[in-house]
């Protein structure tokens, strides 16, 4: 038997409101109970969205991620906050549902189904988040995004036909197509996680920023469960729609974040706050042990987006004061992938230290980096994974594509907001 009590008026206060109690007695037998009736606030302390667009071979991993989230919710972590799940079941279909706690279990209620979805379009994404705002209004919003990732590189510029030839060499049409990083699967089935489906239906970071701006949301954090998304170019694109970026500068194993461990840190203090230290620490500690000794690889960092524009000002000074970057074969840069030739992503600080020899500017850079990517959030295992275990010798927690000679990078990077702000 289900008993539903509906209040006549909304609870416009920030806390639960006691409405009274109900005495219940079963018609058969003598069982009795008194139930306290409370009304949750109309506007939740926070709404967190788990956003899982279609990502091809990651779908089964998404289902495991959802089960891990449900384990956490069953621990009664939400209280008056809300957790919504957007899941695409194909390239064009999806559902929006709510996960909630009920008597020691996590339950799921479907809110809306979608047909003919195209989440590469800003209008579609805006529509999804407009509905989320109406359905689950909150004082603050957070989001986790699970998919394949390719940092800032535009979907239109990263298809196989564009190739990844070194800039200035043979034209793209004559170069052989190469695999994406998520197509490299080890003999025992392990692979890693472009912000999209791994095909042509991918969402540009600029499109996502445009869509969320139109929806009138500024997230407390975007947690990217994707490869390569801790990138200074990405952070600049998204700086106005989120306060923090939680992401990895390198590849993320296909398993993704351990959500049963991470999710409680997104609902601390009775569901009203979040703990970035706890998120990063739980990710790091999980991957120190994950499938050891072959796949225990993980790196994470947090970018404070309110500091990114100041970092751009410092980088402009460095670029203006420095000659063009020339690679030193004796001091190879820390790279964050070994699958694309030429490499696309390098450690930002390592690059700056080889680009610039002005002591005062380097000091200013270090100070600004500490504000932009705080050291306490920069955690990594000894190795990261990229078609095998690769050593991390220096780690600022954030990448740049500036030194790359990849045709895809060279043909597109000058159009990024970061490049324009720093040159």
Where are these regions (language model features)?
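A short beta-strand micro-motif common to beta-rich folds, especially ectodomain repeats
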Residues: 3-7, 15-28
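Surface-exposed loop and adjacent secondary-structure segments within mature catalytic domains
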Residues: 86-113, 140, 144-199
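Extracytoplasmic/secreted cell-surface and envelope-processing proteins
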Residues: 57-62, 92-95, 151-155, 229-234, ...
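Structural recognition of the beta-strand scaffold that forms the well-ordered cores
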Residues: 47-52, 82-87, 141-145, 220-224, ...
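Interdomain boundary/hinge segments at the C-termini of tandem beta-sandwich modules
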Residues: 35-41
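Terminal, contiguous helix-loop blocks that mediate binding/assembly
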Residues: 170-423
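N-terminal extension/subdomain marker
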Residues: 41-139, 414, 419
């Amino acid at each position: 038997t289900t008993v539903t009590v509906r209040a006549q008026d909304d609870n416009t206060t920030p806390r639960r409101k006691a409405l009274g109690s109900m005495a219940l007695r079963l018609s058969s037998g003598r069982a009795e109970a008194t139930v306290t009736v409370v009304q949750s606030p109309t506007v939740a302390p926070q709404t967190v969205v788990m956003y899982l667009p279609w990502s091809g071979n990651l779908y089964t991993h998404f289902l495991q991620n959802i089960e891990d989230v449900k384990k956490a919710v069953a621990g009664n972590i939400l209280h008056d906050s809300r957790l919504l799940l957007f899941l695409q079941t194909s390239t064009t279909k999806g559902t929006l549902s709510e996960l909630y706690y009920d008597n020691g279990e996590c339950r799921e209620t479907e809110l809306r189904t979608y047909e003919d979805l195209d989440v590469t379009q800003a209008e579609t994404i805006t529509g999804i988040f407009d509905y989320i705002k109406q359905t689950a209004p909150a004082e603050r919003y957070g989001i986790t995004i699970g998919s394949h990732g390719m940092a800032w590189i535009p979907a239109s510029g990263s298809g196989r036909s564009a190739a990844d030839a070194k800039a200035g060499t043979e034209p793209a049409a004559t170069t052989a197509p190469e695999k994406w990083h998520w197509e490299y699967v080890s003999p025992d089935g392990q692979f890693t996680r472009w912000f999209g489906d791994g095909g042509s239906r991918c969402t540009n970071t600029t499109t996502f920023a445009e869509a969320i701006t139109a929806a009138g949301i500024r997230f407390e954090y975007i947690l990217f469960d994707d490869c390569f998304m801790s990138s200074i170019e990405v952070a600049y694109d998204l700086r106005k729609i989120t306060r923090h970026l939680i992401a990895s500068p390198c590849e993320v194993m296909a398993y993704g974040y351990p959500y049963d461990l991470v999710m409680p840190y997104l609902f601390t203090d009775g569901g009203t706050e979040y703990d970035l230290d706890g998120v990063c620490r739980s990710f790091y500690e999980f991957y120190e042990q994950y499938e050891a000794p072959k796949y225990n690889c993980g790196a994470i960092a947090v970018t404070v987006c309110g500091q990114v524009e100041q970092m751009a000002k410092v980088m402009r000074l460095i670029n203006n004061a420095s000659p063009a970057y020339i690679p030193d074969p004796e001091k190879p840069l820390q790279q964050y992938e070994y699958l694309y030739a030429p490499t696309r992503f390098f450690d930002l600080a390592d690059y700056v230290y080889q680009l610039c020899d002005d002591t005062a500017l380097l000091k200013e850079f270090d100070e600004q980096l500490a504000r932009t990517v705080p050291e306490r959030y920069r955690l990594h295992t000894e190795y990261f994974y990229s078609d095998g275990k690769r050593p991390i010798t220096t780690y600022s927690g954030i990448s740049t594509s500036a030194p790359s000679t990849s045709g895809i990078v060279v043909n597109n990077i000058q159009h990024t907001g970061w490049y324009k702000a720093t040159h």
